[in-house]
């Protein structure tokens, strides 16, 4: 009979489900403090989606409180708040944040208030305690899928005391579509957002800048990168890298309109902005092809500009990138064939500086004479080209076919690198700053400039330097002589003062007759006294 009972017990134990042996510290329930929050840690695994549902029924009344589900995005950060009872014991206790497993019954400390941080979480986790508020905050940054799992935030010298369990999940970034805006007429709209793919609604990093004037805007898609778009009521942007712009009704009529150009991404190959068309040539359409090649610090950029009657394109090819990016800008003209602007390709690197500085030196007042317009700079010996029809007046009258070489109005512009067009071997550096109003372009080698009508100004400026030098030397010699004269006068005054002091000291040593005793003074003044006379003192009779 006893043998049969033993066999039944063994058979029953073989059909029982295997259970994990609990932690030895949890076997003695009576020895645990009253604030201990018991949980079945053996059943908590990092792979379980809700790690806090399988808990023990033992819960302390002052257990920690906080969020049970924390979610973040890859590369982002999460903030976890753990509230505890603000008692005097809890304020000074150790606060920690740990992760369960592996093995599943061990909670490995990530960060605690004892200045401990796990080596895998350094520079991305921080724990801040607020004892007066009964709160400590854990912040985890640079999230990755490896951070998914179950975590505990608790109080106590060990990680099995008073704690709160939570589940951390990493979710994918939200998908979005490209918005469509409808600003009012003449409104400038600039947005910075990702660009959308024509197939899916996933965004890729990039920046699209929209600039235009009209009543309706419709942007569909673009490629990753940086681009500028000009659109209006009749224009629609198609998927790709080509932007179409159609002017509105009468809103682009006044003034000169700047045609947008693609913004290059490389800082070394920064191209200058398009130069606006002069007022005299607003109704004229140029048809030519200009190609300029220059080499920057890090990349070689070839700019080719094609201007035709019906459309204009700007093509930018970058040689330092593994792929070829082509940005095109096409402007459709209206029925009257109105030229919105002149798109001129950048010719040389020095043109960038000239465009920034030359407008300060181009305008010349009508009150200036002809000599101030056609002069050259003696120190630099360089000529700067200008446009008489746009900004320069000769004797107060605008001209059409005459190119005037004029001196930069400020030394700051010439030293910063104006366009210096010199004859002879300076040919490659010559660049026109603006298009001529009427007439063909004139090469810098031909003598088509209006030179100074007063050549004697140059000789007078040359003789001015020696005269100023001699004048400076003369003034220096006069100052030296004056200083010597003052020094001699000061020396003579000091010598006279020393002599006077010595005489005063001598008179103090030899007393005057008034300072002698009364008897001696009487003897000196008494001339009637005989020569043999002598003063005798009466003798006293000695006493008995």
Swiss-Prot record:
Q: What's the superkingdom here?
A: Eukaryota
Residue ranges occupied by any Ig-like V-type domain in the UniProt entry: 61-169
Q: Is Transmembrane helix found in the keyword set? A: yes
Q: How does it sit in the membrane?
A: Single-pass type I membrane protein
Ranges annotated as biased composition (Polar residues): 220-232, 280-291
Stretches assigned to the Extracellular side = 17-462
Glycosylated residues: list them: 167
Instruction: Name the segments for region: Mediates immunoglobulin Fc fragment-binding.
Output: 75-97
Broad class of where this protein is predominantly found:
membrane
Q: Where is this region: Disordered?
A: 218-325, 511-544
Question: What Gene Ontology molecular function terms does this protein carry?
Answer: transmembrane signaling receptor activity
Name the Pfam families on file: V-set
Q: Where is the composition biased (Basic and acidic residues)?
A: 307-325
Give a short account of its post-translational modification: N-glycosylated.
Q: List the disulfide bonds.
A: 82-153
Q: Where does the UniProt annotation locate this protein?
A: Cell membrane
Q: Which residues cross the membrane?
A: 463-483
For this protein, the record's InterPro entries field holds: CD300_family_receptors, Ig-like_dom, Ig-like_dom_sf, Ig-like_fold, Ig_sub, Ig_V-set
GO biological process assignments: adaptive immune response
Q: Name one GO cellular component term.
A: plasma membrane
**Does the keyword Signal feature in the UniProt annotation?**
yes
What UniProt keywords are attached to this protein's entry?
Adaptive immunity, Cell membrane, Disulfide bond, Glycoprotein, Immunity, Immunoglobulin domain, Membrane, Receptor, Signal, Transmembrane, Transmembrane helix
**Residue spans, topological domain Cytoplasmic:** 484-544
Quaternary structure note: Interacts with IGHM; this interaction facilitates the endocytosis of IgM-coated microbes or IgM-antigen immune complexes.
* Record's function text: Functions as a receptor for the Fc fragment of IgA and IgM. Binds IgA and IgM with high affinity and mediates their endocytosis. May function in the immune response to microbes mediated by IgA and IgM.
Full protein name: High affinity immunoglobulin alpha and immunoglobulin mu Fc receptor
Q: From what organism does this protein derive?
A: Pongo abelii
Q: Which gene encodes it?
A: FCAMR
